[in-house]
Amino acid sequence: MTNFTFDGAHSSLEFQIKHLMVSKVKGSFDQFDVAVEGDINDFSTLKATATIIPSSINTKNEARDNHLKSGDFFGTDEFDKITFVTKSITESKVVGDLTIKGITNEETFDVEFNGVSKNPMDGSQVTGIIVTGIINREKYGINFNQTLETGGVMLGKDVKFEASAEFSISE
């Protein structure tokens, strides 16, 4: 069994969404945690739970962030966390239940496992994974949008994300 200690200082969770049909808006969730159990040498034994604090959303625009926290989007007064609980993990895919605003759907995302390395600063063993995917926000009741004069919509339905998580590990 491997002991995993999440290193939030060396991890990130970023997203982007199409805006006004012509550009992308990017942001991040600044508070999240990932708990992992299992043997790093046998991916079939790994189980992980990611917990994201939606009120930590950061798009570098306070007014937009406040709107994203409202009931039009994440409803952070009522829904204080987003969770992803794995069902299976391989070196290239992860399948699990994603819950946003109390709505749960099974999702499959891509995984990039970057092996194990020794940290020269303290001698600890570290590992990292990068998880990428696309989430249809409308499946989670995040339906806010406005029609544009050109016939398009203000916001795309698909949200692309990249989560990079680093862990100290020990046996």
Swiss-Prot record:
Pfam families: YceI (PF04264). It comes from the Bacteria. InterPro entries: Lipid/polyisoprenoid-bd_YceI, TTHA0802/YceI-like_sf. Transmembrane segments: none annotated. Gene3D superfamilies: Lipid/polyisoprenoid-binding, YceI-like. Belongs to the UPF0312 family. PANTHER family: PROTEIN YCEI. This is UPF0312 protein SAR2769. It comes from Staphylococcus aureus (strain MRSA252). The lineage of its organism: Bacteria, Bacillati, Bacillota, Bacilli, Bacillales.
